[in-house]
Amino acid sequence: MTTRVTVREATTADAPVLAPLLGELGYPVNAKVLAPRMVRMLARDDEKILIAEDEQGAAVGLLALHVFPVLAYDRDLAMIMALVISERARGTGVGRQLVERADQMAREAGASRLMVTTHVRRADAHAFYERLGFEFTGRRYVRAVEEE
């Protein structure tokens, strides 16, 4: 069953409904903390946050997209920085709709590729992205940047 949603660009006023979604992804945050982050992100032309709302106007998904130049390609790279679907809406096509919109935005921005990383333990996410045509190409390593 596909859930009919409206996908639109988020604003900082959406922080109260986006914060719980980030919590479901494993990043607990409240609107007071999230809003300033969104202000910084949305002030940039290369950052977009999409929100999916169901027919009642409830937020059921979010996607953060970053478009940037890289040395390896002539054209920019677009990266999905976050994708989360509310537990009640998973498996209903909301994620696919958000990724399709991100793909459209990436093309409009002139990007040559759409990329995403997921945690090694998220086998369900790996399968989801592969169903959408993404291919596994490598590993991601992360370390904290220490303040001096």
Named regions from a protein language model:
Residues 99, 106-118:
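Conserved GNAT acetyl-CoA-binding A-motif
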Residues 9-16, 20-75, 81, 144-145:
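Acetyl-CoA-dependent GNAT
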Residues 2-4, 144-148:
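Generic C-terminal helix-cap and adjacent flexible tail
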Residues 96, 112, 120-138, 143:
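Conserved active-site alpha-helix within GNAT-family acetyltransferase domains
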Residues 68-70, 88, 121-123, 146:
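Short coil/turn motifs at secondary-structure junctions
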